Structure formats: structure tokens, C-alpha cells
Amino acid sequence: MGLSDGEWELVLKTWGKVEADIPGHGETVFVRLFTGHPETLEKFDKFKHLKTEGEMKASEDLKKQGVTVLTALGGILKKKGHHEAEIQPLAQSHATKHKIPIKYLEFISDAIIHVLQSKHPAEFGADAQGAMKKALELFRNDIAAKYKELGFQG
């Protein structure tokens, strides 16, 4: 299920928009995730108390988490599918320490797509959306395979 060179080009061009404002994109992605799927808050001890969108937007910890996640994801996307070295420790920590179900990675992927659509409608057309969805699915599938190796049924 690899991506073509053209698809990777679309993914990385779009990701350039994210990198221009990682804190803003990260915050918006996590607010979208937590408001759309409040059950995901339970996996984040430092965010469990956040009940409203306003509280979420005011949280410096949430902003930092957004930067951490999107920076890591950007590094993975830039590997164009050759991300074994990056995926291994991520899968290990998400399976054994954080116990993040794959379903939650689908939720955050959907949040990323939504945020890109809303922040960059002109640059994130159907082709770019399709390529990004494919890249995020590749990432999730590779994490899921590592989860299986680790015996985590997330």
C-alpha cells in the first residue's frame, strides 16, 4: 500500500504548511481529537481535567503535546514509508507504557485531515487529502504490526 513519488510530494508539500505553525496545528488537532472523542482524554493524565474547548486552548501542556506529536509525525512522513527506526520506539511506548489503541490513532489521523482541510482548503484538495490519508494509514498499519509483535491488542 505504498505511496507513489507524486503522492509523497503532495504529503510533504502539505506538511510544510504544518511545519510553518506546528504549535497552532498541534493545538487544533488535539482540541479536535478531544472534543470529537472525549474518551481519548482518559489516556492523558495531564489533560483529563480539561472539559471545555476554552480550557483545552488555554493549556500549555496541550500545546506542548501537539508540538511533540506533530514533530514526530513529520519526521516519520519525511521518511516516505522507510520509517522502521522511528516506528519501533513509538510503537513500544504507545503499546506498553501509554496503551494507546489503534482506534485512537485513527481518530487523531481524522483530526489531522480535518484540521488541514479547515486551515488550508486551497492547498489541501482531493489529491492531497487522498495522499495524506494513505500516508497516515501506512503509519497506522505499521504501528499495528509492531503492536502485534509486542502482544498488544490495541
Swiss-Prot record:
BP terms from Gene Ontology: removal of superoxide radicals
Tell me its EC number(s), please.
1.7.-.-, 1.11.1.-
Q: Which UniProt keywords apply?
A: Cytoplasm, Heme, Iron, Metal-binding, Muscle protein, Oxidoreductase, Oxygen transport, Phosphoprotein, Transport
Keyword check for Lipoprotein, yes or no.
no
Tell me which residues bind heme b.
Answer: 94
**What Pfam family is a match, any one?**
Globin
Task: Tell me the domain of life.
Answer: Eukaryota
UniProt-listed InterPro entries: Globin, Globin-like_sf, Myoglobin
Q: What are the Globin domain coordinates in residue numbering? A: 2-148
Gene3D superfamilies xrefs: 6.10.140.2100, 6.10.140.2110
Compartments, as annotated in UniProt: Cytoplasm, Sarcoplasm
| Recorded catalytic activity of this chain's protein | Fe(III)-heme b-[protein] + nitric oxide + H2O = Fe(II)-heme b-[protein] + nitrite + 2 H(+); H2O2 + AH2 = A + 2 H2O
Query: Which SUPFAM superfamilies does this one have?
Result: Globin-like
A GO cellular component term found in this entry reads: extracellular exosome
| Modified residues annotated as Phosphothreonine in this record | 68
A single Gene Ontology molecular function, please? nitrite reductase activity
Phosphoserine modification sites are 4
Assembly and interactions?
A: Monomeric.
Family to which the UniProt record says this protein belongs = Belongs to the globin family.
General function of this protein: Monomeric heme protein which primary function is to store oxygen and facilitate its diffusion within muscle tissues. Reversibly binds oxygen through a pentacoordinated heme iron and enables its timely and efficient release as needed during periods of heightened demand. Depending on the oxidative conditions of tissues and cells, and in addition to its ability to bind oxygen, it also has a nitrite reductase activity whereby it regulates the production of bioactive nitric oxide.
Q: What is this protein called?
A: Myoglobin
